[in-house]
Amino acid sequence: MAAAELISADTVTTSTHGAVAPAWHTALVLFVLLGFSVLGARLQHLTAHGRSPDYLAVIAMEWVLVAFIWFGLGRRGIPMRDLVGGSWPHLAAFFRDLGIAVAFVLLVGGAVLNGLGYLLKATPPKAMQELFPHTLIEMILWVVMSWTAGFCEEVIFRGYFSRQFAAWTKSAIAGIVLQGIVFGLAHGYQGWKLMSLIAFYGMCFGMLAHWRRSLRPGMLAHGLQDTAGGLLARFLMH
């Protein structure tokens, strides 16, 4: 996943792929994502009635958005499996991607982001602690929400937006950077410091997908990261 490899493959990758959906479709997806950010801001202040309804709302919204992307892909005759890429014809292929995912979470999610977070003095708002699960039902729903995000957000950002922006700019690198920025903006309710870290993390996920020509390792990494982050935070708070 060296930078030289990414640069050398830049024009080659984008020359073989056109836009994956109409421009109006992408504009509408971007508009809907603003709702995710608004919902996130709302969730920070909702605790009295429990978190389960809000987790379910996020799960539903993400699947609806992926369904809309699937609709847009269909208008261009692009199967969802082409956007996801890769395959698991045998267990060895799955465990290979799982190993890559674990290494990515530990090295990039752990070492790099923690280092940058320390330099930026980026800390989550206290209200965000209320987003983490407290009860058994909430923990189960958190896991479901985490793996929903692992699949859906990788399809949305590293699949759909990355391919779309790369086609428009004729550059895979630009596609990776732009989708990372949108990923950060979708988490804008966390403050500009954390938003910047999330945008950078999104770009790292984009490079991983570009390197592997598949969203699968990123999906596994994303699901693992979100699951572990929420459950660990829940136990550390008690």
Please tell me what each predicted stretch does.
Residues 45-55, 80-149, 167:
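Juxtamembrane helix-loop-helix connectors linking adjacent transmembrane helices
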Residues 172-187, 202, 223:
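Small-polar-interrupted transmembrane alpha-helices in polytopic inner-membrane proteins
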Residues 32-42, 105-111, 180-188, 226-232:
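Aromatic-anchored segments of alpha-helical transmembrane domains
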Residues 35, 190-238:
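Functionally important transmembrane alpha-helices
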Residues 152-178, 207-214:
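Membrane-interface helix/loop boundary segments of multi-pass membrane proteins
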Residues 47-49, 185-193:
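Membrane-interface helix caps and helix-loop-helix hairpins in membrane proteins
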Residues 27, 55-56, 94-99, 139-143, ...:
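Hydrophobic alpha-helical transmembrane segments
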